[in-house]
Amino acid sequence: MQNWFKSGDSLNLVDLYVKKFMDLIEIERRCEMDFHKNEIIKLGKKRENVGRAILNLKGKFLGESLGCTIVRFGRKKPFKTEISPGDVVLVSKENPLQSDLYANVIYVGKNFIDVAFDVDVPKWVYKERVRVDLYVNDITFKRMKEALREFARKRDKLAYIILGIEHPEKPLREDIKLEFYDKNLNESQKLAVKKAVLSRDLYLIHGPPGTGKTRTITEVIVQEVKFNKHKVLATADSNIAADNILEYLIKKYPDLKVVRVGHPTRISKDLIQHSLPYLIENHEKYQEILALREKIKEIKEQRDKFLKPSPRWRRGMSDEQILKVAKRKKSYRGIPKEKIVSMAEWIIRNKKIKRIINNLDEITEKIMNEILAEADVIVATNSMAGSEILKGWEFDVIVIDEGSQAMEPSCLIPIVKGRKLIMAGDHKQLPPTVLSENEELKKTLFERLIKKYPEFSSILEIQYRMNEKIMEFPNKMFYNNKLKADESVKNITLLDLVKEEEIDEVDRDIINEIPVQFINVEGIERKDKESPSYYNIEEAEKVLEIVKKLVKYKIPTNVITPYDAQVRYLRRLFEEHNIDIEVNTVDGFQGRENEAIVISFVRTKNFGFLKDLRRLNVAITRAKRKLILIGNENLLKQDKVYNEMIKWAKSVEEEHKNKIIQK
């Protein structure tokens, strides 16, 4: 990556930075669009088998909600799919390459999928043999490019800090006493909040797993509003992370005026009353909009009784010419006078509709701007910060959560709207997903800035998630032993959830107070021809055996594995045995936790992307009371870090067995 921190001509640096990222974004955009196009080209049945399409559907109108048309696509035969709420889908008459009809997924059932359309829905949607494909559009890439252009245009102090041309300024005063609204913050959280609020340009909060990063960030947001009297734009790269910020804010600070900007289908149902579409519909002036919509509907019905001026009937005439000829009430260019008069009536009513729509848009925009102006905090994804809705809006502070999971240009979308930046993240966990495999895009703005300006950052030190023994290895490997387990979780085990006398002897190898166990499986890594991903049958069988025991005692459990093929194999296996627990990749489970976590490493010959140690960190730190590691010891021992992991797991098990003997 170009070293933006070298001294030099600031104008050239800005231009170099913008050009570099413009090129990288375009490469990534092409990779993503090509990937989805190539996926869609695959035979429909094959694509359905891997969960990326649903075939042979029929649409049913369900109603309208928040400005969208809701349609249920169903069939008799149940389906398994990777498509989930919030996804964009391409709806087609069996051939997705010939369609440009997009919808947002609301809900996925066993044999139906509910979607929301923002456009008029064609009649064929309600007929047989409709196909739905998982899709991606390139709007976020367009917004990244627009943000880069704005970054180049503004060239303000924050831009120069990002490039290393200028240095963040120290606070004018550090002796100010803050009154914390969240009374349960620990000392490291309070310190991070105070330093962030008193900072003038930039502050970075490093939040390792379970340390209450989002909780800390929400206190920062409230302090910015209450103490600094600032208007805040709070963002995250994903809708789930944005909803987490919103949820914390409304639960802990109900007097705060918070508005969530985003498509209603991508916002949690529990939070929808704080969304912009909902607030618009409940505004006192919304009745005017409803009245205008009724008027449009009424005029459309009148209009459609007349002849639409299609090219066949226009014979090259413009609307104005048709209106002129109609007044003469004569035939023209071989068109009977009745047809000309009918077309004129259609045009007159269509013009009325357009005038009303313009009026409707003006009223909607006025209501929207009133709501946004009254808000203390606006919450959105990074991408939605660049939408038309927030065009022209400026903020005192930009707060970005999960900053270590977003590509640098994604963070620029909200950043160009503010004067001060506060970011929270953990660069020791997974980087953003980059299809082009470009290392320069994988290195995040959060990581760059925290390495450049360590004095403008702090780490949250107390973790509230896991047993201290589970924490031990990641703490040493990734966090320089700075983490401490809170007393509330320090010694938690499965035996807090299950009475020891109720455990059958055959289950005690797993259902015990040992927080970490490594189980060696001499399996074989396999790969199917049509998939680049790996699976391991022997490991899957061992996972099943262990999960059966955990489920028997109703212990909340998840299985994590780095490979999609192993995820699919395990899901089928669990379905055959009527086991209903979630299996996911490391990427799919980041930001979450459970009482017991089982990890299947899969590989037996080569490491593949097991080599990305951030994946290992994420996988391990999802567990609260029990972590079970399943892998091929002969392979894993060849890597220094994995060898340390095995030694650690065995030492924890040995230590607890000795304690049991001593009892």
Curated annotation (Swiss-Prot):
Keywords: ATP-binding, Helicase, Hydrolase, Nucleotide-binding. InterPro entries: Coronavir_polyprotein_1ab, DNA2/NAM7-like_C, DNA2/NAM7_AAA_11, Helicase_ATP-bd, P-loop_NTPase, SF1_C_Upf1, SMUBP-2/Hcs1-like. It is an enzyme of class 3 (hydrolase). ATP binds at residues 207-214. Pfam families: AAA_11, AAA_12. Its EC number is 3.6.4.-. GO terms for molecular function: 5'-3' DNA helicase activity; ATP binding; DNA binding; hydrolase activity. The keyword ATP-binding applies. NCBIfam families: IGHMBP2 family helicase. PANTHER family: DNA-BINDING PROTEIN SMUBP-2, DNA2/NAM7 HELICASE FAMILY MEMBER. Belongs to the DNA2/NAM7 helicase family. This is Uncharacterized ATP-dependent helicase MJ0104.
